[in-house]
From Swiss-Prot:
It comes from Homo sapiens. Residues 322-331, 552-564 have a biased composition (Basic and acidic residues). GO terms for cellular component: plasma membrane. Transmembrane segments: none annotated. InterPro entries: PA_dom_sf. Residues 171-209, 314-340, 533-566 are annotated as: Disordered. This is Putative uncharacterized protein ENSP00000334305.
């Protein structure tokens, strides 16, 4: 469609066609008058070409002289679209100040172009309606607008400002750009003053591009070669990647380093079924030692623990800082180990990718402490007996701060602390063997290292100063590497307060309790907690359907908070799906926590997958179920304690016991068989801190404890583990040993806590 000729100038007689004018009495009936900011509000759809920008050329060609201003004034006076159905003229519709902006309206780049383009459209179509005198009518000074710095991207070339652009296109063009010089433009001499200010025309499209084959044959190989050289230089600066050594790997911790360094201490399970069950130990042996290491001094023990080749046990001279990096092209001493790739983290910590649940005891330098049976003094080839067991899983992380800490710790790793024979316990026959006896000086805080430089706490649990210092085994979640992201649904503050109040009553008991009545407090606590409702974690399918009081259903977020900022809800076992790989114990199976476990300290046994939980003293024997067989039982001890009103710690203890460890005897409390038996608890404590209702950090803790073994004086012990506040992260377990008559209560002992680094999210998932 050919655009119409430009509008005639003032004073020119033009034959008017009456068909072009039409009187409207009701302006609301006009088509498309609802939106003044849209291009179609003034001109019907698809008529832009008919009413293009060509009509304003006659105005812009005049320049900035008085004649051009008068002509623009005449055009605005004849614009019939301005001020329709208004007593006052509208500056939005016909405001002659083209580049004016409304002060109360935020004008973006797109809306600014629309506003200016709209006013230019109004100047193209003259009208007969008068305009108010208070609106100044003028055109922008073209040459002053064009005075931009050289190389400016928003400066169009000569003649580029008269493009036909839709009002809503918002292209980066200058609506008030300079037009073509008209008859009233300055002379050539005056125009030459501004010639140096115009940028050169863009001729990039005229350049001849290179042929594709030339780019492929010349430039691409050169670029690839340069990239290879750059990567080679970067690789030279990097440390060699760590390799997993199943027996020995030297990795020193820098001397005096106050940052928490996580080191994995695991136990190998390649031959688990051969040595986890034994009938009687042959003789006491140091943990991880070969028979050749017996009788050696403590100074030689650490070297023997690491295979005799490691430098872990060497004593560093005072003030000498060992190089934390391994020597270049140096091969660590290994024997019969298989190299596998490890994950390289920020602090050069070694965490396996696939064998998160496969224990392998490793020292602070990254070397394997024990690579064969847990103790060479045991009889690994003896047949499995259902009544006896050793440590079934040793999976925890030890936080080390300096090399000296590990040296002292490694010299205390002795099997005598773990031997089931009470005569071999270093602390006497009344105290159970606990792991913290061995690791009593390992602690890293934010400001100092508690180790050989300060007074060491007692390693005897019967003494008062045993682990009396406050420990911070993890400085914070930002400084921890390898921690799993374990979601936690915290217990309600009111429920936790009632639970702690009831637990405090259990701790006030100072006399032996009749075995027939010992289950009373546990039963009462279960009755008290039976009314608790589990709302489940956000997004879970087991959320409560109960409505009201701010309790959400389905996938709604929790909004039930009390004034202290604690999130509402109840912590139960349903909140976690504990997916345990039983490859370490009894084949490839999975066990799930299917029912809430609310009895603190009372073992709740789980049989084979698919069986139900059993609580209370009248638990049937494994033979009555017919599905347990020689499988191991799992017991869960939920732990809940507050270190302060702002910090809440929640824990689970997973106890692995033998098949016939707990048996009911004529309705009385379960007792242990005459033979000695030990169980290992792995409580999982999730530590959360609240500041104004927001979770500040989330850390994992692992604690270890060993149940009291049966002795001649106490055949029916009832072990309860109650979590108390000790420092900021340590856990104290009150172990109450009872017998039929007069069995003394044993003193409480504490467990060693450390951060979790071996468990991954696949081991702990929300249901």
């Amino acid at each position: 469609m050919t655009p119409p000729p430009p509008s005639p100038l003032l004073g020119t007689q033009v034959k008017e066609d009456r068909a072009d004018y039409k009187e409207f009495q009701d302006f609301s009936s006009l088509p498309d008058t609802h939106n003044i900011a849209w291009d179609h509000s003034f001109y019907p759809f698809q008529e832009e070409e008919e009413h293009g920008v060509k009509g304003v050329e006659s105005v812009l060609e005049k320049g900035v002289l008085d004649e051009g201003v008068l002509e623009a004034w005449g055009c605005c006076r004849r614009c019939r679209h301005a001020g329709w159905n208004r007593s006052q003229p509208s500056p939005e519709l016909a405001g002659a100040v083209i580049h004016a902006r409304a002060p109360a309206v935020g004008c973006r780049q797109r809306s600014g172009h629309l506003h200016v383009r709209l006013k230019q459209r109004l100047l193209e179509r003259p009208c007969q309606e008068p305009l108010g005198k208070k609106y100044q009518l003028e055109l922008p000074p073209l040459y002053e607008r064009a005075r931009k710095p050289e190389g400016s991207k928003n400066l169009p070339a000569d003649g580029q400002g008269l493009r036909a652009v839709r009002a809503d296109a918002a292209l980066p063009v200058w609506p008030g750009g300079p037009g073509r010089p008209g008859p009233h433009a300055p002379e050539a001499g005056a125009e030459g003053q501004h010639q140096g200010q115009w940028p050169p025309a863009d001729t990039r499209h005229l350049r001849t591009p290179k042929w594709p084959y030339k780019v492929a044959t010349e430039e691409k190989p050169e670029a690839e070669e340069a990239e290879k050289k750059r990567q080679a230089k970067v690789q030279e600066k990097r440390l060699p990647p760590w390799k997993k050594r199943t027996l020995n790997q030297v990795h020193r911790v820098p001397w005096g380093q106050h940052r928490a360094c996580q080191v994995m201490l695991l136990v190998s399970t390649k031959q688990l079924q051969r040595y986890l069950h034994f009938e009687k130990p042959a003789k006491p042996a140091n943990m991880g030692q070969d028979p050749d290491c017996f009788g050696k001094s403590e100074g030689e023990l650490a070297t023997c623990l690491c295979g005799g080749e490691s430098v872990v046990g060497e004593t560093e001279a005072p003030g000498v800082r060992p190089d934390p990096r391994p020597e270049k092209d140096a091969k660590p001493a290994v024997s019969g180990c298989q190299e596998e790739s490890w994950l390289q983290s920020e602090y050069d910590e070694m965490h396996p990718r696939e064998e998160m649940n496969v224990p392998s005891l490793r020292s602070g330098s990254g070397c394997q402490v024990s690579g064969s049976p847990l103790a060479k003094g045991l009889h690994p080839l003896q047949p499995c007996h259902p009544h006896y067991m050793m440590w079934e899983c040793c999976l925890f992380t030890l936080t080390l701060g300096t090399q000296a800490c590990f040296e002292v710790c490694a010299r205390r790793l002795k099997l005598a602390h773990f031997c089931p024979d009470t005569s071999l316990w270093s602390c006497g026959g009344q105290s159970p063997p606990v792991l913290c006896q061995l690791l009593d000086i390992i602690s890293v805080s934010r400001d100092k290292v508690i180790g050989s430089h300060e007074k060491k706490p007692s390693s005897n649990p019967n003494q008062d100063d045993f682990h009396s210092s406050e420990y911070a085994y993890r400085c914070g979640i930002a400084e921890a590497v390898g921690l799993p992201s374990i979601p936690v649904h915290p217990i309600g503050y009111y429920d936790a307060e009632k639970l702690l109040e009831y637990e405090s009553l259990l701790l006030q008991v100072s006399e032996p309790v009749n075995p027939e009545l010992s289950a009373g407090p546990i039963t009462g606590l279960l009755d008290r907690l039976s009314g608790f409702r589990d709302h489940g974690p956000p997004g879970s399918s087991c959320r409560s359907q109960r409505k009201g009081n701010g309790v959400e259903t389905k996938d709604q977020a929790h909004r039930n908070r009390d004034p202290r900022g604690f999130q509402g809800g109840v912590l139960t076992a349903r909140l976690f799906k504990m997916q345990v790989s039983l490859e370490l114990f009894c084949g490839h199976q999975e066990h799930y926590l299917t029912r809430p476990v609310l009895a603190p300290g009372y073992p709740v046994h789980l049989g084979k997958a698919g069986t139900h939980w059993e609580q209370g003293p009248n638990m049937p024997t494994p033979e009555q179920h017919g599905t347990w067989g020689n499988r191991h039982l799992f017991a869960v001890l939920p732990l809940l304690f507050y270190t302060s009103l702002e910090i809440m710690s929640i824990g689970y203890s997973v106890v692995m016991a033998g098949r016939n460890v707990w048996q009911p005897t004529k309705g009385q409390m379960p007792h242990q068989p005459e033979q000695s038996c030990q169980t290992l608890a792995l409580p999982m404590t999730i530590r959360h801190s609240w500041e104004g209702g927001a979770i500040r950090e989330s850390s994992g803790w692992v604690s270890w404890k060993c149940h009291l073994k049966a002795t001649e004086a106490s055949q029916n012990p009832c072990v309860r583990a109650t979590a108390l506040r000790v420092g900021c992260s340590a856990v104290t377990y009150g172990v109450l040993g009872q017998a039929q008559g007069s069995a003394p209560w044993t003193s409480a002992f504490k467990t060693f806590s450390a951060g979790i680094a071996g468990l991954e999210r696949h081991a702990w998932e929300t249901m």
